[in-house]
Amino acid sequence: MELTVRSILKQTVLPDEIVIADDGSGEETKKAIERLQRECILPIIHVWHPDEGFQRTVIMNKAIARANGEYILQVDGDVLLARNFVKDHLELAEKNHFVCGSRILLEPKITEKILKKEKFPPPFWKMPLGFVLNSLRSRILRRYMAKRYARSIGHMRGCNMAFWKEDVIKVNGYNEDLLQWGHEDSEFAYRMHFAGIEKKALKGGGCVYHLYHKQAPRDNEERHNQELSKVISGKVKWCENGIDKYITKKDK
C-alpha cells in the first residue's frame, strides 16, 4: 500500500486527494498511513472497517462514498502506477462512460527488486512478453483504441478503473452481497452498462504494475458467476445492497 501511495505522489498530474479503502488492516498499516498523511502534500483519507474476512465490495463502497471528487480513479493496494497514469486517465474521461485500464503482472524476481527500492518501472524488455504493449505510451493509440478495444463489458481490471461518482450512485455501487473474490467488478460494470454508462478501454498508457503475490482463494467464484449471469440475463441496473446506505445528502 505504501509503495502504491508513493507512486501516486510521483505522478506528472496529481489527483486532488487519495482515499485508502482499508479492509481490516492492523496497527502497522495504520501507522504507515499516519506517516504518509504527515509527509504527503495531498489529503489522504483513511477509510477502515474491522477485519471480518474478505469484504472488498463493502470497503470500496464506503471509500467511494467518502471521496470528494466527481471523477474517481480506482487502483488496488498492490500496484504501482506509471508516472502518467492520472494524466492518461483524465484524457479519456467522458460523461456517461467508465474506463478500464491495463495491468502488467510482474514476475517474482522483478517484484523483489522493486521492493528492495531498485529501479522502477522495469525496462520493457524485461516485461513478460504478453505485457510489452501495455508498457508502451502513445496518445494516438489511446484515442484510437478507447472505443475499439473495449472488448466485453465484463472484461474488467478492478485494479485499474475510472468512473464518475454520480454513475456509481446511479447503480448503487458495488454489490455487497458478493463478499468473496471473483467478478465483483464485472457485475458492477454490467449494471453501469445497462444503466446507459458505456465502457472505454485505456490502452497505450495509464497502466499499473501489479506486484507479484499468491492469488486469493476462489471458494465463492461459482456463486458469484451465478449472480453475474442473473445481472446479464435480466439487464439489471441496480443492486439492493449497495452504496446508498453511506451516501450523504450532498451526494444525492
Give each language-model segment a name.
Residues 155-156, 160-172, 179-198, 203-204:
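A short, conserved alpha-helix in the catalytic core of glycosyltransferases
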Residues 50-67, 84:
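Glycine-rich, basic loop-to-helix element that forms the pyrophosphate-binding segment
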Residues 76-80:
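The conserved acidic donor/metal-binding loop of glycosyltransferases
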Residues 119-153:
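Short, flexible, basic/aromatic active-site loop/helix in glycosyltransferases
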Residues 84-124:
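Conserved donor NDP-sugar-binding/catalytic core segment of glycosyltransferases
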Residues 14, 22-32, 53:
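A conserved acidic beta->alpha catalytic loop
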Residues 72:
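Short aromatic/hydrophobic "clamp" motif used to bind/position activated sugar donors
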Residues 6-15:
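Short, acidic, metal-binding catalytic loop of nucleotide-sugar glycosyltransferases
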